[in-house]
């Protein structure tokens, strides 16, 4: 299992929207093959940007309200939030370099 903390519908506002740091949210599900492929990349990003970016995962099967609120149609979807607003997103299993360069714009 991933070392990246999980958030839920109930904790999303506090953990993501109210965060002082930019937040990368990995919308995923256990049955999703590409989600499993991108999980190690998300964990590496979490370690690489520790203290600069908060990285969390949201299981879309267990937390459909938040996924629906942000129009998640396919997973994995990686969304970046800053100041309580969605500022960017990357859909699909992407290389670490793609994810890192997207994140860098918001640091």
UniProtKB/Swiss-Prot annotation:
Keyword Transport: yes
Cysteine-cysteine disulfides: 32-35
Entry GO MF terms: protein-disulfide reductase activity
Family annotation (Gene3D superfamilies): Glutaredoxin
Annotated keywords: Disulfide bond, Electron transport, Redox-active center, Transport
GO cellular component terms, A-Z: cytoplasm
Keyword Kinase carried by entry: no
Domain Thioredoxin as annotated: residue spans: 2-107
Function: Component of the thioredoxin-thioredoxin reductase system. Participates in various redox reactions through the reversible oxidation of its active center dithiol to a disulfide and catalyzes dithiol-disulfide exchange reactions.
Family from the record: Belongs to the thioredoxin family.
This protein's name: Thioredoxin
